[in-house]
Every structure is written in C-alpha cells, then in structure tokens.
C-alpha cells in the first residue's frame, strides 16, 4: 500500500506538535534531574540492549568479562538524540532501587536507518559491524530485494553476509535457481552461508561468522530470522511465526529490538521484522556506489554524466554485454533507480 503523502501545511502542523511535545518533555526532564541527581551514582559506560518506549535497558560496559555484566532499566534525557539498540552511552545507576538515567551517547561507528511513516530517517540499530541478509526458498527469494539490503549495507559501511535458511526445503526443482542466485553474490565477494535452523544443520559456519562481531539479521518476514537466533542461542527462545497461507509472507514475531550475547563471543541485534525496506534519501549516484561492481566501472564511461541507460560508450552496458558483470544486477539497479522519487526516497514493499 502506498504511503500517505502530506502537504506542506500538514507537515508543518505535525512538526509543530512534535516540537511542543519535545519542549514539554525537556521541562519535565529538567525538573526531574534536580529531584533525582542526589539519588544517582557515578557516571559509567554502558550499551543499550533493549528499548521500551520511554525507557531503555542498559548493560554496564565497565569491567571485563561476562561475569561483570549488569543490566538496569533507565530513563533517558529528552535532549538526547533517539537512542537505539547497540548505542554506547554514558549512564548513571541509581544508588538504591529504581531506574538509572542515560545522560549521553558516545559517537556511533555505524548506524542502520530506515524511513518512518512520514519519510523521515529513523535509526534502528547502532554500531553494527555485520549485516546478515537472510533469505529462504519460501518466501521466494528476490535478487532485487536482496540488492536493497546489500546497498544499505554498502552505504552504511557495514559488512554483509547472505544466509540461505531453510535449506531442507530446496528440492531438485529449486536447486538450480538457488545455486545460480548464491553464485552471483559469491562472485561479487559476498559470503553465502547455507543453513537449516529447524534441524540445526550447518550452523557451524554461522557461529564462525558471528564470533567477535556485532551483527544484525535482516530479511523479509518468514525467512526464519528468529529461528536462526534460536539456533545459535537457544536460551533466547524467541517467538517463531508461520507463513501466511494467504500471502505466502511471514508474520512479524519480534516486537522489541534487543541485543543478546553469543556463547562464542560477539553480539546479535534482533530487531522487528521489516516487510517494507526503503533506500533512504539517496540519489542515483549513491545507489550506484551501493553496487560495488558497477561503481568500479562507472569511471570508465565515455561521458561524465552518463545515465548508464543507452549512451554510447557506457562501461556498465558494455560490461554486461561482454559478460563481465551480471545482467540481473544491472537490471535490479535500473529497477531500483526507477523507483526513486523526486526527493530521493525509494518506496518498495515486499508485499508486492
């Protein structure tokens, strides 16, 4: 379903209401800080491990080893930018019972964002080192959708690994298609892991990929992200959904973003399922840089302002004709480029 388009007056009205709410929250926060300052301990480092609306869960980062980890529910100052799971913060624990307070955010190494319902950028996870792009035989994988995740990873500076889940569903009919799709991405340098979460088969490569990194699973609903987390971290016991018999799409089962620690080292951020994935505020030049093999070739085009569509001497077209790049990837680039609207925001729904 298309997103609601707002006129200038409606956007001004929404921004005015939001500004008034922020002002009221800031005044309340100033009063609360005066009242509770004496009840808080010394400032210390921490990491946001969960977000619950007006409160967050903070894990203390002071002291080495898992035995020193403690978590505490906290308020956060209204003057802070939006907190997300994975944020490294400065916080003050309560001296007795009660809630702590997050007082500052440390600089982010990376931030993963997506547009909200008004088209504004909204961070969903911070300090992610690796994006695990999950796909499965069902719902039927789309290279165009996979490319969207990979472009997002490239532009965010996050390493990407593709994870083919539900390998037990691959029959003789599906195998050639799945192998061709996987080989296309392996040829580009993206690792592709083939696993089966329900049977715990082939999870060793996934454990190795997760070790020592902060990772996030992405992918359309129904591909088994929660099942994979249960496979590598059984005590997480995340709810698992079935595919809808009507749409063939999965049902969203994760309702709160959360950071969990893995026995082999590293952290995993599980965030609510994303059925619609937009490429935020980008133009065609940015989109081009999200395609690593196309970006390398673009400088060899005959014309500096080449649109890579039908100009003579276009290096991308020549490379596709010569078999040096995959025609499917170039077609996906064209498709995504065509969906970029005039203000640079792309709209795409995996429901379609």
UniProtKB/Swiss-Prot annotation:
Hydrolase among keywords: yes
Q: What is this protein called?
A: Small ribosomal subunit biogenesis GTPase RsgA
| Recorded GO MF terms | GTP binding; GTPase activity; metal ion binding; rRNA binding
- Pfam families of this UniProt entry? RsgA_GTPase (PF03193)
Question: Any idea what job this protein has?
Answer: One of several proteins that assist in the late maturation steps of the functional core of the 30S ribosomal subunit. Helps release RbfA from mature subunits. May play a role in the assembly of ribosomal proteins into the subunit. Circularly permuted GTPase that catalyzes slow GTP hydrolysis, GTPase activity is stimulated by the 30S ribosomal subunit.
Which Gene3D superfamilies does the UniProt entry name for this protein? Nucleic acid-binding proteins (2.40.50.140), P-loop containing nucleotide triphosphate hydrolases (3.40.50.300), Probable gtpase engc, domain 3 (1.10.40.50)
Q: Which cofactors does this protein require? A: Zn(2+)
**Principal subcellular localisation of the protein:** cytoplasm
So what family is this one in? Belongs to the TRAFAC class YlqF/YawG GTPase family. RsgA subfamily.
Biological process GO annotation list?
ribosomal small subunit biogenesis
Q: Where is the CP-type G domain?
A: 109-277
* EC number(s) per entry: 3.6.1.-
Q: Which PROSITE patterns match?
A: ENGC_GTPASE, G_CP
* Record InterPro entries: G_CP_dom, NA-bd_OB-fold, P-loop_NTPase, Ribosome_biogen_GTPase_RsgA, RsgA_GTPase_dom
Q: Which residues bind GTP?
A: 165-168, 219-227
Q: How does it assemble?
A: Monomer. Associates with 30S ribosomal subunit, binds 16S rRNA.
Question: Where does this polypeptide localize?
Answer: Cytoplasm
Show the disulfide pairing.
none
- Cofactor binding, per record: Binds 1 zinc ion per subunit.
Instruction: Give the matching SUPFAM superfamilies.
Output: P-loop containing nucleoside triphosphate hydrolases
Entry keywords, A to Z: Cytoplasm, GTP-binding, Hydrolase, Metal-binding, Nucleotide-binding, Ribosome biogenesis, RNA-binding, rRNA-binding, Zinc
The kind of enzyme this is, by top-level EC class, is: hydrolase
One GO location term (cellular component)? cytoplasm
Top-rank taxon, per record: Bacteria
């Amino acid at each position: 379903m298309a997103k609601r388009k707002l006129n200038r007056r409606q956007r001004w009205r929404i921004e005015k209401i939001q500004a008034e709410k922020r002002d009221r929250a800031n005044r309340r926060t100033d009063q609360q800080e005066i009242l509770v300052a004496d009840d808080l301990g010394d400032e210390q480092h921490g990491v946001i491990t969960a977000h619950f609306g007006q409160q967050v869960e903070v894990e203390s980062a002071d002291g080495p080893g898992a035995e020193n980890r403690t978590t505490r529910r906290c308020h956060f100052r209204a003057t802070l930018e939006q907190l997300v799971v994975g944020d490294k913060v400065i916080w003050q624990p309560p001296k007795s019972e009660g809630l702590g307070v997050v007082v500052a955010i440390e600089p982010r190494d990376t931030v993963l964002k997506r547009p909200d319902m008004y088209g504004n950028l909204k961070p969903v996870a911070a300090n992610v080192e690796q994006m695990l792009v999950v796909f499965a035989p069902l719902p039927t994988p789309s290279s165009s959708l996979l490319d969207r995740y990979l472009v997002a990873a490239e532009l965010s500076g996050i390493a990407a690994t593709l994870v083919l889940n539900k390998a037990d569903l691959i029959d003789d009919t599906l195998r050639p298609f799945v192998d061709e799709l996987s080989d296309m991405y392996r040829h580009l340098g993206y690792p592709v892991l083939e696993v089966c979460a329900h049977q715990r088969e082939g999870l060793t490569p996934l454990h190795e990929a997760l070790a020592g990194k902060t990772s996030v699973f992405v992918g359309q609903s129904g591909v088994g992200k929660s099942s994979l987390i249960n496979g590598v971290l059984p005590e997480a016991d995340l709810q698992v959904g079935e595919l809808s018999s009507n749409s063939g799409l999965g049902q969203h089962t994760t309702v709160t973003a959360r950071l969990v620690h893995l026995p082999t080292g590293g952290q995993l951020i599980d965030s609510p399922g994303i059925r619609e994935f937009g490429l935020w505020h980008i133009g065609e030049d940015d989109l081009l840089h999200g395609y690593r093999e196309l970006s390398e070739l673009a400088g060899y085009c005959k014309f500096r302002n080449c649109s890579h569509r039908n100009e003579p001497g276009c290096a991308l077209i020549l490379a596709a004709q010569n078999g040096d790049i995959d025609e499917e990837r170039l077609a996906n680039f064209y498709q995504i480029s065509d969906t970029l609207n005039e203000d640079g925001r792309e709209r795409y729904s995996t429901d379609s």
